[in-house]
Design a protein with these regions (language model features):
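Acidic catalytic motifs of isoprenoid enzymes
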Residues: 1-164, 168-184, 193
Length: 193
């Protein structure tokens, strides 16, 4: 359920695609800076979407930088970052950790156990920094796991579990946007599931 959101490039204007890629590069950079190479390996489009949405909503002061990296070693790329990029990076790592946990529990993938173990210390710090989101994500995924183990055919119930998760993830801070962001996150989560 995590890592399924992608951008439909043919439908975006060139300027919008450039902006999307710049936020994606910004997230990648922050993941590396704050969580190291293993954090960078968790990069997804899902959080890029959330960062763009929240940055637009909160009109965060966004910094534009040019940089080269291993993926783009020759031509410098535009990188957009702000305070919400750090939040998105933390949520990205947290979601990746639980994704690895799920893969380990379901399929006994050694690679998932390895990555999960490497992320454990970083995730502990994220849980301390974002306790509300951490508890909600863990609770929703546990509820979803129970539904899956029971072989639940109630799609609304199982999709609702992931909706609850996304509802909390979209809620960057409790303010006047809380109700709107909760609804948006909930229904987007149900749709993704």
């Amino acid at each position: 359920m995590f890592g399924y959101v992608t951008v439909c490039e043919p439908e975006l204007k060139v300027k919008d695609l450039k902006k999307y890629k710049a936020y994606y590069c910004g997230l990648c950079h922050v993941l590396k800076e704050e969580y190291g190479f293993i954090g960078q390996m968790t990069l997804t489009y899902d959080m890029t979407f959330a960062i763009i949405l929240l940055s637009s909503l909160y009109e965060s002061d966004t910094r534009a930088d040019m940089h080269c990296c291993k993926v783009h070693p020759v031509k410098k790329q535009i990188m957009l970052t702000n305070e919400i990029t750090s939040y998105g990076a933390a949520m990205n790592v947290l979601m990746a950790y639980y994704h690895m946990e799920d893969d380990w529990q379901d399929e006994r993938k050694v690679s998932s156990l390895t990555v999960k173990t490497m992320l454990r210390g970083k995730v502990k710090k994220i849980m301390e920094q974002y306790p509300r989101q951490s508890r909600a994500i863990e609770s929703a995924l546990n509820e979803l796991s129970v539904c899956e183990r029971e072989g639940s055919t109630d799609l609304d119930k199982t999709a609702g579990c992931f909706g609850k998760l996304m509802e909390e993830l979209f809620l960057y801070k409790k303010d006047r946007w809380e109700e709107t962001l909760r609804k948006m996150g909930f229904f987007m989560g149900k749709f993704i599931y």
